[in-house]
Amino acid sequence: MLIFPLINDTSRKIIHIDMDAFFAAVEERDNPALKGKPVVIGKDPRETGGRGVVSTCNYEARKYGIHSAMSSKEAYERCPKAIFISGNYEKYRTVGDQIRRIFKRYTDVVEPMSIDEAYLDVTDNKLGIKSAVKIAKLIQHDIWKEVGLTCSAGVSYNKFLAKLASDFEKPHGLTLVLKEDALCFLAKLPIEKFHGVGKKSVEKLHDMGIYTGQDLLAVPEMTLIDHFGRFGFDLYRKARGISNSPVKSDRIRKSIGSERTYAKLLYQETDIKAEISKNAKRVAALLQDHKKLGKTIVLKVRYADFTTLTKRVTLPELTRNAAQIEQVAGDIFDSLSENPAGIRLLGVTMTNLEDKVADISLDL
C-alpha cells in the first residue's frame, strides 16, 4: 500500500532552457579570436599565486577535465594553454536580462533558476501555440539571432523531466520527453543524473545496489522511506517521472547580495570603502531588477586568516537607495574592531525584502 498518494499531472507543457557555457560563450561572442580555444572564466593562477576558482569554462576546456568550482591552479595544470578571463558580470547580467525578455514574449510564467537557466510553463502561452517543442525552437532561434548565443532546451510535462532533458543533448540540443516515454528515458540514466539527488544520497543508493533509474524503479516505496525518510518518497516519485512542482514566476527571494573575493588583499581604507561602494551599487541594481526594497543591510568581511565577520543594521524604512546602502555598510565597517590582516572578501547583502512600494523614494 502506498504511504503517500501518487498524483501525476501530465497535462502541463514545461520547457527548461539552459544556456550553453554562458559566461564563456559571451566572451567568445565578443572576441571571435577565442573560438576553438580553451576558455576559462576565472582568475589566472599565474597572477594570483595559485588562488582562485573556475566559475565556468567552454566546451573546449571541458575536454581537459576542467569544470566549474575547480581551482584555477588545477585548471592550469590540466591545460596550460587555457585562456583565463576574470569575467565581466555586469555584462553577463545585461545579456541575461535580454534573454529573459525573449522568454516573456511567449509566457509570463517564467521561473529563473540562475542568470543562465529558467523554467517556462507554456501550457497557456501568449501566442496560443499548442506545441511546446515549437516554442522551444522559436526561443532557441530568437536567442541565437538576437543575442548570438546557443542554448539547450528540455521539454516535458514537469520540471524534473524538462531539466533532465535539457542536459541530455548539449550544446544547442532539444530533447522532448513524452509521458509515454518517461519511464524508458529515466531507466537508462545513472542515478547521479537525477537532479535533487546529492552526493551523499548517491553514495547511499549505490550501497543499496541502485545505480540507474531502472534500479530505483524496482525498489519498494517503504524501503526508500525507511532509508531516506520523506526524501524516499520523492525518490519513489522521481523514478516514475512524477513531479508536480509548479513553475513559480514569483519566486520569493529572502535576500539580495553582492560579494567579491580579492586575489590581492585589501589593506587601505580607501580601497576597502571603494569596494563596499561597488557592492552596494550592485545590490541596489539587483533590487531594482527584482522590484524589491529591503530593510536590513548586512556587511560580510573575511580576512587573510579566513576569520569571517558579519554584522547587520535594520533601517526604520524600506530602501533600495545605493547611496544609503553604501553609507550604512561603510558605517558597519567603521564599527568593526581593527584587524591588521588584509581583507580577502567583502560582501553587502539586503534582507527583509518586500515588493516595491510606489510612494517610497527609489533614487539610485
Swiss-Prot record:
It catalyses: DNA(n) + a 2'-deoxyribonucleoside 5'-triphosphate = DNA(n+1) + diphosphate. The record marks 23 as: Substrate discrimination. GO terms for biological process: DNA-templated DNA replication; error-prone translesion synthesis; SOS response. GO terms for cellular component: cytosol. Pfam families: IMS, IMS_C, IMS_HHH. Disulfide bonds: none annotated. It is found in: Cytoplasm. InterPro entries: DNA/RNA_pol_sf, DNA_pol_Y-fam_lit_finger_sf, DNA_pol_Y-fam_little_finger, DNA_polymerase-Y, DNApol_IV, PolY_HhH_motif, Rev_trsase/Diguanyl_cyclase, UmuC. The active site is at residue 117. Monomer. This is DNA polymerase IV.
